[in-house]
Amino acid sequence: MNIMDFNVKKLAADAGTFLSRAVQFTEEKLGQAEKTELDAHLENLLSKAECTKIWTEKIMKQTEVLLQPNPNARIEEFVYEKLDRKAPSRINNPELLGQYMIDAGTEFGPGTAYGNALIKCGETQKRIGTADRELIQTSALNFLTPLRNFIEGDYKTIAKERKLLQNKRLDLDAAKTRLKKAKAAETKSSSEQELRITQSEFDRQAEITRLLLEGISSTHAHHLRCLNDFVEAQMTYYAQCYQYMLDLQKQLGSFPSNYLSNNNQTSGTPVPYALSNAIGPSAQASTGSLVITCPSNLNDLKESSNNRKARVLYDYDAANSTELSLLADEVITVFSVVGMDSDWLMGERGNQKGKVPITYLELLN
């Protein structure tokens, strides 16, 4: 029974305090009561903490979007994190693309130029997928986790103490108001005692809040180190991807797009990257087409009408019916035709005949 009486009294006291704060807050808003202002230093610290919280949240959320663009995947990871369980490993986009390329290359045949290239590209895409996974893991651990710890830990503590300071300030101003309204000596003495207590509690809470807020500078320093870790992780990722693509380009013998054949023109010749390097300064780009000084053995052929055997260096798909498609390593017969563009020869394979680009050929003795 005594416990029940105590609980009722406590509930009544809490209700009275809440009502007193509500009245004080309302009168302040209406301009009917004075408000104790916080000192400028404390106000600046509060503003700095609020600003830090807002921008930290924005940076954290956008970094999550950058690392995982799929919103469904982010929600799934969030749920598993709240359940304190590890999210199942899922294949990422580069890895999926890589697998499709490898499967396609296997289907087309690893022995064909296109199939072999697809397999090599697929393997590179898988390496990029692995690098992407490592970037996400490193960034989450070294950058996102510290930011989230601040939002969900340090700032929540600051917000709690700030709210408590606001309540102590309302209690203090309510006590000041009651003292002003007190007329009887006994009531005035009681109000003065209450004011001293509320002032002491307010000062104590202001000091606690100030000490917490001064830790924001340390938070900034910590987040700076985390930012450097994030930049280093990105630098490693992009350097890896660049190296993977550079290696792939070398494997494929890739060449710049302006060296590709123009299907709408017959005056230009596609030049493989490796061959253009071998030719060197003799290759010059002009008005979208490529003019090449032919190797001496091809010049000899142009000056004669004799047929010669030539080995095909690279696969070539005919752009139209006047051209002849080629397969790497096959041997065909070639000869010159009066009036034909200098970058082309006439090729013959059995009953098939058509123009072929000279840069795809190696004349045989």
Swiss-Prot record:
PTM comment text: Phosphorylated at Thr-145 by CDK5; this phosphorylation is required for autophagy induction in starved neurons and facilitates homodimerization.
Pfam families xref list: BAR, SH3_9
One annotated Gene Ontology cellular component of this protein: mitochondrial envelope
Domain SH3: 305-365
Main subcellular location: cytoplasm
Additional notes on this entry: Fibroblasts with a reduced level of Sh3glb1 show a defect in retrograde transport between the Golgi apparatus and the endoplasmic reticulum.
Protein name: Endophilin-B1
Organism: Mus musculus (Mouse)
